[in-house]
């Protein structure tokens, strides 16, 4: 059986990147929460 995690920088960025987050209302909330918490990295 193959491993379920097959890393790809492109897919990671498209799914969890900054522009993907900002594209939806809830994604914007995610970024806002992480900013408020003081996260060094906001998105993947």
From Swiss-Prot:
Cysteine disulfide partners in this protein: none
Region (Disordered): 24-44
One annotated Gene Ontology cellular component of this protein: ribonucleoprotein complex
Keyword field: Ribonucleoprotein, Ribosomal protein
GO molecular function: structural constituent of ribosome
Entry keyword annotation includes rRNA processing: no
Pfam families in alphabetical order: Ribosomal_L34
The organism's place on the tree of life at top rank: Bacteria
Compositional bias per record (Basic residues), positions renumbered to this chain: 31-44
Entry keyword Aminoacyl-tRNA synthetase: no
GO biological process terms, semicolon-separated: translation
InterPro entries: Ribosomal_bL34
Family (UniProt): Belongs to the bacterial ribosomal protein bL34 family.
Name of this chain's protein: Large ribosomal subunit protein bL34
Species of origin: Caulobacter vibrioides (strain NA1000 / CB15N) (Caulobacter crescentus)
């Amino acid at each position: 059986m193959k491993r379920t995690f097959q890393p790809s920088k492109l897919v990671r960025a498209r799914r969890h990147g900054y522009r993907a987050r900002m594209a939806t209302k809830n994604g914007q909330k995610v970024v806002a929460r992480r900013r408020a918490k003081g996260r060094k990295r906001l998105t993947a």
